[in-house]
């Protein structure tokens, strides 16, 4: 698992000197941080370390080894266990594997956070699977970015009702969340069939350079059930990050295909191959949900606001990496669009969905409210001056209107200037 990560990140000039979760935390916190971090132990990394990309259930010995890794990480301070079941290698895990691993996290008081298996053809089935894992493991659960795909064939009302029934009738601790945008990020290479990119970077590059693979992939885009076609086709996907073609950022794939003078399939291959071993960081954005479904999800009182972004910065080793606009200004967009403009929420409720609600869902005691004996994590902003400075072709930009940020009682940002203070802590602590 570590070798896969290193291969995809080698151009960040980062030294991965750790082999265990505790060593990772030491590397993360020893230089000091300006923010608090509640790390989750990732199922995908553990499965890769034990089984690679094997598309089968683990043997008893393999499962015990994975359980030991989860136990080790939880003992080191992880806040919980996370899965991404729509993607490899998580998609190869069955319920027995997930319950066993989640139970280890639960024994340490951890939570279970999941990108569920499917939000389209088997949306309800995937939610029920997650509820069963939460139920049998005996831990709180968080179902992430839960809006249905635009082409989902199951009613969202019924999915939400199933979640509320589990909460109300069984007292299961279940939270849900979403980012406040109909657009979602993704690596360009994942438009291709999983067998192309599920491997170490060098092997993936060998496949990407094969004319036979190009032809096989071309056939998949003729299938009307193809994920890309169901989301509107090539004109509905936009490039957001490419080191080799920064001038094309913001253009859709139909336009890029015309500029390259090749068909859609070759366009994808040309984009990902141009960045060599860094191909996984060639990024796109696409429609995540309909405005109606997103609004319905946001209106749920148990729905927290999250970014679905990554840690990045417009300077340093990550300055050229763009995930999507959600890494910056997502809170500003939520307040501007849904609190100020549409008035779907009071300001107080909007802030609750970004503070005490997610803190409680993650079991972060003493966080998320301005109360005596609570940690002084405080943000002061000017409602009138709030401005989202990101755009589709320039998604990395800080907002206006944030006057002060205090973390654990120390000022880390004031009037747009970083104080260089490093008061961040690992949570829960």
Where are these regions (language model features)?
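Acidic, glycine-enriched loop/beta-strand segments at the rims
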Residues: 254, 280-288, 294, 342-351, ...
């Amino acid at each position: 698992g570590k070798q896969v990560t290193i291969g995809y990140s080698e151009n960040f000039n980062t030294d991965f000197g750790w082999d265990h979760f505790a060593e990772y935390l030491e590397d993360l916190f020893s230089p000091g941080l300006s923010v608090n971090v509640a790390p989750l132990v990732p199922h995908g990394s553990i499965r890769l370390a034990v089984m690679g990309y094997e598309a089968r259930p683990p043997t008893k010995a393999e499962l015990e080894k994975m359980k030991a890794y989860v136990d080790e990480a939880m003992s080191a301070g992880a806040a919980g266990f996370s899965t991404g079941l729509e993607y490899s290698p998580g998609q190869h895990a069955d319920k027995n594997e997930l319950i066993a691993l989640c139970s280890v996290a639960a024994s340490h008081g951890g939570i279970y956070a999941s990108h569920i298996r499917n939000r389209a053809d088997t949306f309800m089935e995937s939610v029920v699977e997650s509820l069963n894992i939460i139920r049998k493991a005996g831990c709180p659960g968080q179902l992430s970015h839960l809006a249905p795909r635009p082409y989902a064939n199951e009613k969202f009302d019924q999915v939400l009702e199933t979640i509320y029934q589990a909460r109300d009738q069984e007292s299961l601790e279940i939270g849900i969340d979403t980012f406040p945008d109909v657009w979602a990020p993704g690596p360009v290479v994942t438009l291709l069939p999983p067998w192309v990119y599920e491997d170490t970077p060098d092997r993936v590059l060998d496949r990407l350079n094969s004319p036979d693979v190009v032809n096989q992939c071309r056939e998949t885009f003729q299938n009307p059930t193809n994920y890309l076609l169901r989301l509107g086709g090539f004109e509905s996907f936009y490039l957001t990050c490419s080191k080799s073609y920064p001038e094309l950022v913001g253009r859709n794939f139909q336009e890029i295909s015309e500029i390259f003078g090749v068909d859609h399939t070759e366009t994808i291959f040309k984009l990902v191959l141009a960045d060599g071993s860094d191909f996984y960081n060639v990024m796109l954005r696409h429609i995540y949900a309909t405005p109606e479904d997103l609004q319905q999800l946001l209106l749920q009182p148990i729905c927290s606001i999250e970014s679905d972004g990554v840690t990045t910065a417009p300077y340093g080793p990550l300055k050229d990496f763009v995930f999507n606009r959600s890494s910056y200004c997502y809170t500003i967009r939520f307040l501007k669009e849904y609190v100020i403009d549409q008035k779907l929420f009071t300001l107080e409720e909007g802030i609750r969905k970004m503070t005490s609600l997610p803190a409680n869902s993650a079991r972060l005691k003493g966080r998320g409210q301005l109360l005596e004996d609570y940690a002084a994590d405080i943000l002061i902003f000017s409602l009138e001056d709030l401005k989202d400075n990101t755009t589709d072709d320039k998604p990395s930009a800080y907002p206006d209107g944030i006057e002060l940020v205090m973390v654990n009682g120390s000022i880390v940002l004031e009037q747009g200037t970083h104080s260089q203070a490093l008061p961040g802590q690992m949570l829960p602590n």
